[in-house]
Amino acid sequence: MPRLIKDRVPTPERSVGERVRDFGEVNLGYSWELALREAERCLQCPVEYAPCIKGCPVHINIPGFIKALRENRDNPSKAVREALRIIWRDNTLPAITGRVCPQEEQCEGACVVGKVGDPINIGKLERFVADYAREHGIDDELLLEEIKGIKRNGKKVAIIGAGPAGLTCAADLAKMGYEVTIYEALHQPGGVLIYGIPEFRLPKEIVKKELENLRRLGVKIETNVLVGKTITFEELREEYDAIFIGTGAGTPRIYPWPGVNLNGIYSANEFLTRINLMKAYKFPEYDTPIKVGKRVAVIGGGNTAMDAARSALRLGAEVWILYRRTRKEMTAREEEIKHAEEEGVKFMFLVTPKRFIGDENGNLKAIELEKMKLGEPDESGRRRPIPTGETFIMEFDTAIIAIGQTPNKTFLETVPGLKVDEWGRIVVDENLMTSIPGVFAGGDAIRGEATVILAMGDGRKAAKAIHQYLSKEK
């Protein structure tokens, strides 16, 4: 029985004073020595019973990859090679999920060690394996092995949307021998990984490497293609044997507050897309400036709100997060909240906008806020915010609204016969097939705004379902 070590090995981070001046990654990740020390804490639960595996949406063999690190302690390259081989069976994007997954709610939340101490830092170990493999060319060697083993079956599948669900589905299908083409509306593939998550959380070079690996598997990626406009859905159905829709939830949810259309008010989607995809923070090197005032209000309490707030802070603003519940009810990851607090983002709880106030030129100058109190839990399990009727005014010259996103109705309206629910989410059966035979969907397009790993889980499930569906055809 391994000796129980209650305290996890901390990961190095850049100092606050250094990191707030640029968009470089905050968490520096484990070295081999630190990763091995953390791996030693794992109790090695039997795979068939391991709670961490059950807590992972893609069911990575977590004890298995950690065991590979421990058993090859004198040979880091061999350790990482075996660990990556195990991870890749279930997760093709470990460098990404190791950074952005809410492990504390999933694998780490289920960890047995967490009942008496800190759970194993599974996410950071996964990231270490992926980073070490990339830096030492190990992933290229393993990928070459996989490519050599692919046997083409002559069938074609189209993927609409190059986000986490689409990329995962494409990778799995390519390994099964399908000819896969991804159609992406934007000029860069990656979806939320590229336009939604800032560099300081997910460096874009990592995403680009994963995309390069996908292309090496034989996947074609067509950008600047808006299905329904550039090419019709019916044309895709005629050309391909099956279709997967992974168009995400890219339409911002905006509440109709008075004054919400004033200059200086952004959706978090637009704000982060300009910064992440169009490199607004590098103006004039990139000609996509974004105007951020001296006092910025970010409305919301999820990861997107934290990303927007921390980005605005790096552009030189004084930033406030305004949230209608308390810190306890925030949906953002604890690590992201902690980083925002460390960096100087200010939090105001139990408030919600009543109206936005403009100056004579139509620019935002203040927000009237209403104080809230907490009532009984709602359907989310969190206590419901209740208006008190008490209001006050705070001066802000920029506001970023981060209260959620919904699926893109523009695309959905171009697909005749596709059934959606009242929220605009695509309706699917237990195999992720839509109301149209041979057309599957997953990720935020069926869930609404969710996590990267849940979208990847859908992509993996859909790939298996597509394979079963096409294998049954004569």
Curated annotation (Swiss-Prot):
Keywords assigned: 3Fe-4S, 4Fe-4S, Cytoplasm, FAD, Flavoprotein, Iron, Iron-sulfur, Metal-binding, NADP, Oxidoreductase
EC number: 1.8.1.19, 1.18.1.2
GO cellular component, one term: cytoplasm
Manner of cofactor binding, per the entry note: Binds 1 FAD per subunit. Binds 1 [3Fe-4S] cluster.
GO terms for MF: 3 iron, 4 sulfur cluster binding; 4 iron, 4 sulfur cluster binding; ferredoxin-NADP+ reductase activity; metal ion binding
EC class name: oxidoreductase
Catalytic activity line of the entry: n sulfur + hydrogen sulfide + NADP(+) = (n+1) sulfur + NADPH; 2 reduced [2Fe-2S]-[ferredoxin] + NADP(+) + H(+) = 2 oxidized [2Fe-2S]-[ferredoxin] + NADPH
InterPro entries with a match to the protein in the record: DPD_II, FAD/NAD-bd_sf, FAD/NAD-binding_dom, Helical_ferredxn, SudA-like
Keyword Iron recorded: yes
PANTHER family linked: GLUTAMATE SYNTHASE [NADPH] SMALL CHAIN, GLUTAMATE SYNTHASE [NADPH] SMALL CHAIN-RELATED
Protein name listed in UniProt: Sulfide dehydrogenase subunit alpha
Organism: Pyrococcus furiosus (strain ATCC 43587 / DSM 3638 / JCM 8422 / Vc1)
The gene coding this protein: sudA
